[in-house]
């Protein structure tokens, strides 16, 4: 398809030990494999990204194939952007990000990428990528139109080898994308990007997001009940395809706070498991009528799925009395996923720095209900 002669493969460690990985190597042939990297540290530390960019450039790769989750996808996005812009240091990356924010011209990434996701984080469908400074613990995210994948291959069988908690937790991360996507607070900012995707602004965007959310809620529960259910896995993948529409419509503090939890050892999905319910409660309690209507749509979507409603009812919740915090929290607990910061040994003395980092994150700044550092601290303390 790309006429590639030198393919660079970036794979998760779990996938690299499977027959599928051996089959890929065999299909490409040794002569066409420029290099292989197995594993990227969670939340894509700058050091991993710079090393990856250096390796890809040194091998003169003309195609990159990824097999894995968000950390791998993000690292490749940034690495292929850093190569033409000669970025190899954190100050250089921060300068590049600043130029992108200022809408200044930067050299686009040009190496084509094929993403084969094995989780449900949805990064493979977006042009956003982030990396973490391990010294400061701060994660920075950027967006550029040249960071989209050229091809995304959805293979439900391949995802069966994904660790159970990673699969389920990244599913909650995608739920986070959809629920916060209903906020509608950033739709006006992404008009050009929606047009580029062919996702014109329309009155049906809430219906699209709610439909994808409902499908994901049901299919994710099905995969928990039957780990080898390939049809449910495919439906989960197909639902996650709508993540860009959600992200271009709304986003908020669950993402902003979650970005900063990563450097403390909390996985992508687990950040949403812990923080999303508390952010939703804050937004409901302090939001205006429009915010509550949109959050109400999320509640209706949970209760509108038969399998999900049965699961929620089994916990003692009723549609009449439960708020969105109750509903989302009960769903996450039904998946057997962590709900507190204490489960990751995060201490009280770390919360101040976490709140400061979260307030620097764009997603926190645009939360549909204004947040202060003290309010973020309240959310973090509730989540302990």
UniProtKB/Swiss-Prot annotation:
Its EC number is 1.14.11.-. GO terms for cellular component: mitochondrion. Pathway: Mycotoxin biosynthesis. It is an enzyme of class 1 (oxidoreductase). Keywords: Iron, NAD, Oxidoreductase. One of its GO terms (molecular function) is alcohol dehydrogenase (NAD+) activity. Its cofactor is Fe cation. Pfam families: ADH_Fe_C, Fe-ADH. Coiled coil: none annotated. SUPFAM superfamilies: Dehydroquinate synthase-like. Gene3D superfamilies: 3.40.50.1970, Dehydroquinate synthase-like - alpha domain. InterPro entries: ADH_Fe/GldA (IPR001670), ADH_Fe_C (IPR056798), Alcohol_dehydrogenase_Fe (IPR039697). Belongs to the iron-containing alcohol dehydrogenase family. Dehydrogenase; part of the gene cluster that mediates the biosynthesis of the host-selective toxins (HSTs) AAL-toxins, sphinganine-analog mycotoxins responsible for Alternaria stem canker on tomato by the tomato pathotype. ALT1 also selectively transfers methyl groups at the first and the third cycle of chain elongation for AAL toxin. Gene clusters encoding host-selective toxins (HSTs) are localized on conditionally dispensable chromosomes (CDCs), also called supernumerary chromosomes, where they are present in multiple copies. The CDCs are not essential for saprophytic growth but controls host-selective pathogenicity. This is Dehydrogenase ALT3. It comes from Alternaria alternata. The lineage of its organism: Eukaryota, Fungi, Dikarya, Ascomycota, Pezizomycotina.
């Amino acid at each position: 398809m790309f006429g590639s002669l030198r393919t660079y493969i970036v794979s998760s460690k779990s996938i690299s030990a499977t027959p599928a990985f051996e089959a890929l190597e065999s299909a490409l042939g040794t002569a066409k494999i420029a290099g292989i990297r197995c594993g990227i540290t969670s939340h894509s530390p700058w050091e991993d990204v710079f090393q990856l960019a250096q390796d890809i450039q040194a091998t003169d790769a003309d195609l990159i194939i990824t097999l894995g989750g968000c950390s791998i996808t993000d690292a490749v996005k940034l690495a292929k952007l850093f190569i033409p812009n000669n970025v190899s240091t954190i100050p250089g990356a921060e300068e590049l990000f600043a130029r992108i924010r200022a809408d200044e011209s930067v050299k686009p990434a040009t190496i084509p990428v094929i993403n084969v996701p094995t989780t449900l984080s949805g990064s493979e469908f977006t042009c956003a990528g982030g990396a973490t400074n391990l010294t400061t613990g701060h994660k920075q995210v950027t967006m550029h139109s040249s960071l989209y994948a050229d091809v995304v291959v959805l293979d439900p069988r391949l995802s069966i080898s994904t660790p159970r908690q990673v699969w389920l937790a990244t599913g909650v991360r995608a739920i986070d994308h959809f629920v916060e996507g209903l906020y509608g607070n950033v739709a006006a900012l992404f008009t050009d990007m929606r047009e580029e995707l062919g996702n014109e602004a329309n009155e049906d965007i809430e219906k699209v997001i709610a439909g994808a959310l409902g499908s994901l809620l049901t299919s994710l529960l099905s995969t928990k009940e039957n780990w080898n259910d390939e049809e449910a896995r495919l439906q989960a993948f197909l639902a996650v395809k709508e993540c860009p529409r959600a992200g271009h419509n709304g986003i908020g503090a669950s993402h902003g706070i979650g970005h900063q939890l990563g450097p403390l050892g909390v996985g992508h999905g687990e950040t949403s498991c812990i923080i999303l319910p508390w952010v939703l409660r804050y937004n409901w309690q302090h939001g205006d009528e429009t915010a509550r209507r949109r959050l109400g749509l999320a509640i209706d979507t949970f209760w509108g799925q038969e399998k999900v409603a049965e699961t929620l009812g089994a916990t003692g919740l009723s549609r009449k009395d439960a708020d969105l915090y109750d509903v989302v929290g009960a769903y996450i607990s039904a998946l057997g996923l962590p709900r507190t910061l204490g489960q990751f040994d995060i201490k009280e003395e770390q919360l101040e720095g976490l709140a400061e980092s979260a307030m620097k994150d764009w997603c926190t700044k645009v939360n549909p209900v204004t947040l202060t550092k003290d309010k973020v601290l309240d959310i973090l303390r509730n989540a302990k």
